[in-house]
Amino acid sequence: TEAAMRGEIDFDESFAQRVALLEGIPTSVLDEICARLTLSTGARTIISALKTLGYHTVLVSGGFAYFANYIAEQLGIDEVHANHLDIDEGAVTGHIQLPIVNGAKKAAIVAHTAERMGIEMSQVVCVGDGANDLPMMAIADLGVAYHAKPIVEARADAAVNVTGLEGVLYALGYPALIPIP
């Protein structure tokens, strides 16, 4: 995973290897993992502020939809696009389910979502931390690196390294936190 995020190996190859390791894991274990997930610092603040400002929020992840949907539900994110685990008889099969949400797919999802919502790419902001986020960040008006790998930080329009996700508000031009009702 780390090598793929640094851009050193192919994401699809890394993903297939990770999924194969999950063969036989029961969904009860996935549920336990969900219960233990912690949100990034500032996640609630940024999503709440963006919603107050009228943004449509989308979680585009190269991770698993099983977990991404849980996080999105906790935060009130509008939509989720992530990789689906193939589950049979209550356990992960270890086989990949296509399409894989890799860098190219992330960019396609962002472009399609903007088109579907009737907004220009000049109104799109993408936040990422790994090399597979670079294609979507490149097509957005603003690509923000969040505690990112060096390759991502070098190519981003802005970087948030010291604060939590609420620091993205500053990159959007909001110098202070927006009061949240």
Question: What residue spans do the PLM features occupy?
Answer:
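Conserved phosphoryl-transfer catalytic core
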Residues: 1-8
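C-terminal cap/substrate-recognition subdomain and adjoining C-terminal extension
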Residues: 24, 31-181
